[in-house]
A protein has these predicted regions:
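Active-/binding-site microenvironments in catalytic and ligand-binding cores
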Residues: 1-220
């Protein structure tokens, strides 16, 4: 049987994903007790509204996140978000800047390339918001040249937050490659032999949105 691996952080009211962005809140519209009258004590239901920023938890960036005329979430083809063969890149042994040396000789065409830094171990602490691993501009350029379908990282940002030009976002999204940030559990994935599913809602005009990303690992 295949093995499923959770790759997303849970969304909890009050959680902080990125400095300066609002935290998610929940508004209960109908609770179990209040629903008794509506359904004449024959059934009970719970309905709530979740208020969140698109950049909450583990989320996917569409090209619209970087470009005014870029493809929005609803416009990303499912072939770039689901059933993608995964190539996991171990980036735990170097410094903060991840260059192309670890994947220069790999076939990445039509694959999801996930960069494992183990930075996700800091999730939920103040340390998560400083000194994050990131892709260099050259690494992003190499990913584009290799016709990568999807790029993910278990870090605060795929870019160096000290660089306002955001070269990785600029190059990857400019090439139509979705980005997934704040991933987790990448250490549970093999270098190859797994498939990724990371589909956001089909939000027309939306630029970013949380996903429940997961991998299916072939056990054969």
């Amino acid at each position: 049987m295949p093995r499923f691996v959770e790759l997303s952080h849970q969304i909890v009211p009050g959680m902080k994903t990125y400095p300066g962005l609002p935290e998610p809140t929940v508004e209960v519209l109908l609770d179990y007790e209040a629903s008794h009258k509506r359904y004449q004590n024959q059934a009970e239901f719970y309905i709530a509204s979740l208020h969140l920023c698109g950049n909450t938890g583990t989320y996917v960036d569409s090209p619209r996140h970087r470009y005014r005329d870029g493809v929005d979430l609803a416009g990303i083809g499912l072939e770039r978000l689901a059933n993608l063969p995964i190539v996991t890149i171990d980036a735990t042994g170097g410094g903060l800047a991840i260059d192309g040396d670890a994947f220069r000789d790999l076939d990445l065409s039509d694959r999801a390339v996930l960069f494992r830094s183990d930075f996700s171990k800091r999730w939920g602490t103040a340390a998560y918001f400083i000194d994050n691993p990131f892709l260099t501009a050259a690494a992003a350029e190499l990913l584009v040249s290799k016709r990568t379908a999807f790029v993910g990282i278990d870090s605060l940002n795929i870019d160096d937050t000290g660089d306002p030009s955001r070269p990785a976002h600029t190059r990857l999204l400019g090439a139509g490659i979705p980005i997934c940030e704040h991933m987790t559990n990448l250490q549970a994935l093999p270098a190859s032999g797994a498939r990724l599913h990371a589909v956001p809602i089909a939000w027309v005009g939306g630029a970013t949105f949380p996903v429940r990303a997961y991998a299916i690992v072939d056990q054969d």
